[in-house]
Amino acid sequence: MNQIEQKWQQIWHDEKAFEVSNESSKPKYYVLAMLPYPSGKIHLGHVRNYSIGDVIARFMTMQGFNVLHPMGWDAFGLPAENAAIKNNSHPKDWTYSNIENMKKQLKSMGFSYAWSREINSCDPQYYKHEQKFFLELYERNLAYQKESLVNWDPVDNTVLANEQVVDGRGWRSGAVVEKRYLKQWFLKITDYAEELLNEIQNLKEWPEAVRSMQEKWIGKSIGANFHFKIKDNEDTTIEVFSTKPETIFGAGFIGIAFNHPIIERLVSKTPEISNFIAKCANITCSVELDKAEKEGVFTGLYVTHPFDSNIVLPVIITNFVLMDYGTGAVFGCPAHDERDHELAVKMNLTIKKVIETDIDVQKTPYTEDGILVNSNFLNGLTSNEAKQKVIEEFEKLEIGKCTINYRLKDWGISRQRFWGCPIPMIHCEACGIVPVPYKDLPVTLPDDVSFDGHGNPLAHHPSWKHVNCPKCNKPAIRETDTFDTFFESSWYFTRYCNSNATEMTDKKACDYWLPVDKYIGGIEHAVMHLLYARFFTKVMNEQHYVSVREPFKGLFTQGMVLHATYKDEHNNWLYPEEVVKKGNEFFRKESNDRVVQGRIEKMSKSKKNLIDLETMQKQYGADAIRLFVLSDSPPEKDLEWFVSGIEGCSRFINKLEQMFEAIKFLYNEANKEEFEGNTERSTAAYTLVREDASTGSMYKLPLEASYINKELNRLVHFTIKHVAEDIKHFALNRAIARMRELANAISSEISKDKIDVNTVRHGFNILVQLLNPFIPHITEEIWQKLGNKERLYKSDFPAFDESMLELDTYIMAVQVNGKLRDTYKFKTAASEDAIKQITVNLPKVQKFLAGKEPKKIILVPRKIVNIIVN
């Protein structure tokens, strides 16, 4: 099998089979799988992702489209730097070596990539364009630097975006994230928050889950900003933001963030307050707030109510208010908010009902809208009416106004690491921040760098960071931070349109190819990569690099590949190949020690539940692997890898070869000539009959005695139609099931004593075409042996004949007074009168008629006959 696969991979390479032109009379189709990080080896998660994309690309090519299906490398990142530290080498060497190996692996899987368009994000000829783009953003005030409280990963020694903090830990290292103030570069993604939100509804071909995640991440809130005066210090106020200002008369406290400016100005930091602030500093993002137990500490401050100076409210430092959302302060309404209620109960704060309800709000908050009560001038109004009214009052008193807030924050792009794209800025004592001139781009990374595992090597480099200021020519310092690696992946899909363009994009090529018709990748990128790419596309549109404002028309998120985990008696993880199953128990191959099978989980290096791709390829071949990862589960669901599954796929491929040999024999018997030439369906039927089962001898029936297996012929056309529909809807496992059914039907016909050779041969020819996008190597081989002169990858997808889908017979349910009494198979041509006459005389029906004449006979065509009798 490996020889056949290598043969066709070489043919595709020599014929430039999957290279496409930017100019074609055909309609375009751009299918793209998320580019991989070159970690060293392709894993089965990659294989599943890329197999899905390859089926779509090959299918759309057969459908007559000009298909762009490229591949490249998201090549910057921490693993390369960590490997450099470990191996005392340069990250570039490690990265390029990995790319070479992984590219070889991808080619060995037969993926139909246009390799001439390959991109590598760590290539200066790639990242020089994004450096220029960053400078353009800076000129438009869409990029800026400020001191900010950041998420600091103490293991990777770098800043993390909120999205990269998972349950309080770094998404790569797993280290507990700390809070630090650092100067950081930001992009103003918030300037596009409204458009990013509004356009979600137009992404009709995106999964609802992803659209919902983006909506929640952008998090638009309409409410009000207004001020509370500090009691006994009325010149000082606390500004709060609230999405429910109408509940102001139910206020029980003011909640502020642990780093709110008023704490430094007015609060005496007792040990209790200091300890609480330190604890709050470890909460990194609003996702964690929802999970944390609600806690607070009293500051000693009070504020007065804006509409009733007799009401004073305590100011509480809480662990669920963040400084980077709204104003960093809220008023708590415990009767009508779950978080506020939890804190109020814990701290014995006032809980006052202001929305009519029968619920005891002292025990449970009522969080729905309703009619206002206990609310002075708002009494009797609905929640919406009261919201408008109270905002009007704020504006009259000049203490507040209507405000829109977003959960989305500006994108922090600074990373204190070496292996990333240098930020093209210079810091001059005399001139301040100075952009690197366009003519000096790219700013490249130094080759002579040492890694000791501490901090940023660029900041410690003896010469690289020293440069003269472009404005005053005095000594200055380069920016030593590098871009977040999501910067590179936020525009790479535009570069594939012409990877040799002298500018960031070839706009003419982008106008032809964009948007991407189908983008394929994991749902874990819903609120990072996918949101950033949408943002970049909008800015690139304004910079005239592209004409579209949304990058991806369609999105498909595939499930993960899972495998059982194993541990020895000492709680050490084991690789699957180290384990053998005996009966219902597991043992270590080498020592025969007992092994514990754990949960079935996502394949990962840490738990060693990995399957080596190269080992599988040598044993089963690329086609069998492709078939298994596509056939065992719907592509959007998780897939469990198990040996019996891949073995079954290997047997199916072997069966195809055996079927070919059998059909070749039948054809030769029928025609007494070589099996070659035109494979189109012959108009003349011919039938072979087995003369002697023991010898295999056969004879051909005369034409007038031949028969056509109409059911098999119908199944061929049915399969063509529904496989095409299944592929279009990404129901790839269902498409494979249909093709297996057709293969079984053909195989069954071959084994009969009386064989419709023409339909068998035609059906097999069709089957090979249908299977090609899934298992391209073996199908190309069989296609050639079938006598076809044209390459299968160049062939059209088979057409079906609608008239052939009709059955000669159909089964109807026969009822008496609405109750099922029998069924009957009718010929398609049967008239209504014939149907009525036959059903009335059926023995089972006669039994219930008991000699009576039917009062009425109701027919539901091709489904039910209902005989009504008194």
Swiss-Prot record:
Catalysed reactions listed for this entry: tRNA(Leu) + L-leucine + ATP = L-leucyl-tRNA(Leu) + AMP + diphosphate
Alphabetic keyword roster: Aminoacyl-tRNA synthetase, ATP-binding, Cytoplasm, Ligase, Nucleotide-binding, Protein biosynthesis
Q: Where in the cell is it found?
A: Cytoplasm
Broad class of the protein's primary localization = cytoplasm
Coiled-coil regions in this chain?
none
> If you read the UniProt record, what top EC class would you report for this enzyme, in one word?
ligase
User: Which BP terms from GO are recorded?
Assistant: leucyl-tRNA aminoacylation
Report the residue ranges where the short sequence motif 'KMSKS' region is annotated in this entry: 602-606
Concerning SUPFAM superfamilies, the annotation shows:
Anticodon-binding domain of a subclass of class I aminoacyl-tRNA synthetases, Nucleotidylyl transferase, ValRS/IleRS/LeuRS editing domain
Task: Report a single Gene Ontology molecular function.
Answer: ATP binding
UniProt motif 'HIGH' region: location = 36-46
* InterPro entries recorded: aa-tRNA-synth_I_CS (IPR001412), aa-tRNA-synth_Ia (IPR002300), Leu-tRNA-ligase (IPR002302), Leu_tRNA-synth_edit (IPR025709), M/V/L/I-tRNA-synth_anticd-bd (IPR013155), Methionyl/Leucyl_tRNA_Synth (IPR015413), Rossmann-like_a/b/a_fold (IPR014729), RPE1 (IPR005728)
Task: Tell me one Pfam family matched here.
Answer: Anticodon_1
Residues reported to bind ATP: 605
Q: Which GO terms describe its cellular component?
A: cytoplasm
Task: State the source organism's domain of life.
Answer: Bacteria
Q: Which Gene3D superfamilies match?
A: 2.20.28.290, 3.10.20.590, HUPs, Isoleucyl-tRNA Synthetase, Domain 1
Report if keyword Cytoplasm is assigned.
yes
* EC number, as in UniProt: 6.1.1.4
Q: Which family does it belong to?
A: Belongs to the class-I aminoacyl-tRNA synthetase family.
Q: What is this protein called?
A: Leucine--tRNA ligase
User: Species name for this entry?
Assistant: Rickettsia akari (strain Hartford)
| Highest classification ranks of the organism | Bacteria, Pseudomonadati, Pseudomonadota, Alphaproteobacteria, Rickettsiales
